[in-house]
Amino acid sequence: RNPFRHISLYADMAISTDRFNGDAEDLTNAPNTGFYYVRSTNRTVEMLRRWRAARSRFRPKAHDQEVFEAIKGEFVGGELQIKLVFLDTALFDGFCEYHGEMDRVCTMHANCCLRLVTKLHDLRNVVADWKRYSSLTPPEKMSSKLRWTYPAKCAATMKIPA
């Protein structure tokens, strides 16, 4: 499915979330910088420059997601007036806030999961699930109760955001 159909035309930046509270504009949503869309404008180019420069204000080797979480309000409420929207985890699913609805999801992200080997294991299950789902006829998809395989290996390592 094309994820871009679900990104607001009015957003300067749309970003996936680890936790989505139902309000796409609420800054208390937990952003995940593993998937984001930025409309190319002078303001968004400047936002990306400031995001990169802001890393120097944080501990050495701070992750870009940690930096973004701390400064996102500066972009929205500051001089840049960035229109930031958070993507619904029902469409942009991930292991943090797992929905399992194959008939709606556009992307699947192994967020909150530690260690590459566990991510790869559970993402391989996602690919196998998608192949099974994609092979069904439309009537079979409508009546199917197929869901994503629970990310069991990742669940054992979950780093759940506060």
Language model segments and positions:
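GT-A fold catalytic core of metal-dependent nucleotide-sugar glycosyltransferases
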Residues: R1-P31, F35-V38, V45
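Catalytic core and acceptor-binding pocket of nucleotide-sugar-dependent glycosyltransferases
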Residues: V38-A162
